[in-house]
Swiss-Prot record:
Places the protein is found: Nucleus; Cytoplasm
Name of the gene: hdgfl2
Source organism of this protein record: Xenopus tropicalis
Skewed-composition ranges (Low complexity): 90-104, 232-249
Stretches assigned to the PWWP domain: 7-64
Full protein name: Hepatoma-derived growth factor-related protein 2
Length: 643
């Protein structure tokens, strides 16, 4: 169970990372910071630091004396054991000599520890219980030590004022100036700090005092130089007390080092740095202040930036010049090529154009005589307006160009790249590139038909079946009742007769065969009837072959000899039977023929009856005696089976 303590009780206080430390429960005075609830204000012996701790971290001194009261290597621990026994009422207001009179081995360490603790309390930084934490020299000896946690509060303001008035009255000005000088050393080189720390850890007290005296002498030299350079008088005022101060003032000067452990070794590197640097002005500027160094760095950075910017500008200008030269050379080459082509193609140029174009030639100051001679035929070929525009552009370019010396330098640079330019020209010649500018109207007109022809070639040709369907629709449209177009129908029938039609295509498009049959009986125009019969016979001959042709010839001979209309009707019957075999059914074809006959008119009913009778008689005769029709039917059926 945690015990209840009163102000003045002696205890062992435990903090993380430290042994049980001899301490005293302190009394809270008026105006001081009050401790948080359930915590006590603690005063540590040996280091004279304060903190707020809970009762669980406090142990009575008398009970735990044998357990925790053993000597330890920690700085300030053995002094704390001595203080808790011989001087339990010790506080920060006591002079440093009161503690050092009893023990000759620890006088300077205690005084430095007290001053360090007081300075840390004044600055409001974290307070550490050991003297090794307050100074980097003492920390170097104890490598295994870890810093104690920072205290949450600071000691009472009354105690601070008393102690500061008692100890630092004579040296207040010097200490403040030294603090300023230490703050000026924020920008010292990083390389010097590890060397100084190593040296301080290995040196003893005498070496420290000797180093301080060296630093004082160095400071005095710096101040003299600063006076010569008319620097601020604050540094000179800091040098006079530093020279007159005795060895007893060494702990007072250590106070800012304890407060700022990282800045402690500042005076030592200044002396060494000056020896290495030969220029006195740089030494004085390094020792003046961080502001001066920052300004110097800024100036250097600005100078470097300016130099870099100037270099970049120069490089950009050179690149632009090179590009301009390359463009000029390319233009000259193109013009020369054009001139050569123009001489070959257009040898006879108009004299009037040459006279009009001649005056702008001498205005080109930068161009050489050779280039002018090469440009003359080119100008004669081009129109006047384009030449005037080019003359203006070349004037602007001539004004923007640099001197002839710059051109010579650029040409020398350009000669290093002859291979690249030669490659470019060869590629352009192969491609046949024109010079920069809009193409002429003649060339545009030439290009248009080429593109149109290419597009036409890309289009696919229609198939035979598509052509057949198209012609079929044209024939139907041409033979309308309202407005028939006989010539269009004849042209379509002629094209249809020229098509390479197969039996498979006809089987798919039976409507075409049916329309041809109907057109054969188109009584409105005899030429259409004859053309339809001719086309029909052509298609039939292609499908059935040469045997059918021979049979047709024999039939035609018989027809011409007899000239009987009945026989003509009989041949029509044969053709109808063949058509039916092509379309696949005899009965359906007969029904069609009957329907066509009914449409012819009422006046032809008697003729139709006689035709039907003759057909029946002919059919009976064919059945009794196999004639040409039976042979044709057999051939058609055999072809259908093979297909």
């Amino acid at each position: 169970m945690p015990l209840n303590f009163k102000p003045g009780d002696l205890v062992f206080a435990k903090m993380k990372g430290y042994p049980h430390w001899p301490a005293r429960i302190d009394d809270v005075k008026d105006g001081a910071v009050k401790p948080p609830p359930n915590k006590y204000p603690i005063f540590f012996y040996g280091t004279h630091e304060t903190a707020f701790l809970a009762p669980k971290d406090l142990f009575p001194y008398e009970k735990c004396k044998d357990k925790y009261g053993k000597p330890n290597k920690r700085k300030g621990f053995n002094e704390g054991l001595w203080e808790i026994q011989n001087n339990p009422q010790a506080s920060y207001s006591l002079p440093p000599a009161s503690v050092s009179s009893s023990d000759s081995d620890v006088p300077e360490e205690k005084s430095t520890a007290r001053s360090d603790g007081e300075e840390e309390q004044e600055t409001g930084q974290a307070i550490l219980p050991t003297a090794g934490v307050s100074s980097s020299d003492e920390e170097g000896s104890d490598k295994g030590g870890v810093k104690r946690k920072g205290r949450t509060t600071t000691p009472p303001s009354a105690k601070r004022t008393k102690h500061s008035s008692s100890e630092q009255e004579p040296d207040s000005a010097s200490s403040s100036e030294e603090e300023n000088s230490d703050s000026d050393q924020d920008f010292t080189p990083e390389k010097s700090t590890p060397r100084i720390q190593r040296r301080t850890t290995n040196l003893g007290k005498k070496n420290k005092i000797f180093a301080e005296s060296d630093s004082k002498s160095d400071e005095s030299e710096d101040e003299k130089k600063e006076e010569e350079q008319k620097k601020s008088p604050s540094s000179s005022s800091a040098s006079s007390p530093s020279l007159s101060s005795s060895d007893s003032e060494a702990p007072v000067k250590k106070t800012p080092r304890g407060r700022r452990p990282a800045e402690k070794p500042a005076p030592k590197p200044r002396g060494r740095g000056r020896k290495a640097e030969p220029i006195p002005s740089s030494d004085s500027s390094d020792s003046d202040s961080s502001v001066d160094r920052i300004s110097e760095w800024k100036k250097r950075d600005e100078e470097r930036r300016r130099e870099l910017e100037e270099r970049r500008k120069k490089e950009q200008e050179e690149q632009l010049r090179r590009l301009r030269e390359e463009e000029r050379e390319e233009e000259e080459r193109k013009k020369r090529e054009k001139a050569e082509k123009g001489d070959k193609s257009d040898s006879d140029s108009d004299s009037s154009k040459s006279e009009v174009i001649a005056p702008p030639k001498p205005k080109k100051s930068s161009s050489s005589s050779d280039s002018e001679e090469d440009k003359k035929p080119v100008k004669e070929v081009k129109p006047v307006a384009s030449e005037i525009k080019k003359g203006k552009k070349e004037k602007v370019r001539a004004i923007s160009d640099d001197s002839d010396s710059d051109k010579k330098v650029k040409k020398t640079i350009k000669k290093t790249r002859p291979s690249e330019s030669a490659r470019k020209t060869n590629q352009k010649e192969k491609r046949g590139e024109r010079p920069r500018g809009r193409p002429s109207k003649v060339e545009k007109e030439k290009k248009k038909p080429e593109v149109i022809t290419a597009r036409k070639v890309v289009k696919k040709e229609p198939t035979v079946e598509e052509k057949l369907q198209k012609l079929h629709s044209e024939i139907k449209f041409a033979l309308k009742v309202d407005n028939p177009d006989i010539q269009k129908c004849l042209d379509a029938l002629e094209e249809l007769g020229g098509l390479q039609v197969t039996s498979q295509i006809l089987q798919k498009n039976t409507d075409v065969v049916a329309t041809l049959k109907k057109i054969r009986r188109y009584k409105a125009n005899q030429s259409v009837m004859d053309k339809a019969a001719e086309v029909y016979s052509r298609i039939k001959a292609r499908i059935l072959g040469p045997k059918l042709e021979s049979q047709q010839k024999t039939v035609q001979k018989v027809n011409t000899a007899e000239k009987d209309p009945e026989e003509e009707k009989q041949t029509g019957k044969v053709e109808e039977d063949m058509d039916a075999s092509v379309n696949g059914d005899f009965l359906s074809q007969r029904i069609e023929t009957a329907g066509d006959k009914e449409q012819d008119g009422e006046g032809q009913n008697l003729d139709n009856k006689t035709e039907m009778e003759t057909k029946q008689n002919n059919h009976a005769e064919h059945n009794s005696n196999p004639t040409e029709e039976t042979i044709e039917c057999r051939l058609i059926s055999s072809e259908n089976q093979t297909s």
